[in-house]
Amino acid sequence: MPYLLSFLLCLSLSPIWPLGDNPRAGDPFIIVNKATNKLAYIDDGKIQKVFPVATGKTNELTPEGTFDIVMKAKDPYYIAKDIPGGSPKNPLGSRWMGFNARGTDGSKYGIHGTNQPSSIGKYISQGCIRMKKNDVEYLFDRIPIGTKVWIVKSKKSFQQLAKEKGAIAYEKANEKVGFFYCNKLS
């Protein structure tokens, strides 16, 4: 009985308890840091890759917060200027992963490719997150609908940010349970 109580206490205090903005430990998770214009792809409890990105011309254009990927498209159509998917003139590039920022349905804000690779690393978009072609295709192939995206402006490392959200291994003490450690209470 004391072991069961110990386990339940550890579980309820752990960062893997599925609450609000936190991803479930081990699930794919994306962090975009507007301070560095970089995107971290996290899966299986560790940072898999970090990519350079472009974000909004002004700080307000790219929304901050935790959102969900709600839409994915290959060779997306660019409605604003009636440019078909696959066209070299299409500013969305070869992939679109739309997220539900500011009450939208995934068609306004997204992580996408670009037809201007020299824009990567700059503050230049109208609010979306741009990636190089190979990078966006790599990410697109690995994240499912429902993946959490956390957009933040921070001086912290991706390692620190991911630990805050419970997305990577969290070391607390002696006994390993899933993606976190817990002290024995016996």
Regions found by a protein language model. Give the residues of each.
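Exported/periplasmic cell-wall-interacting domains
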Residues: 22-25, 61, 76, 82-186
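Generic alpha-helical secondary structure signal
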Residues: 7, 45, 71, 174, ...
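Cell wall/extracellular polymer interaction/catalysis modules
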Residues: 15-71, 75-76, 94-100, 167
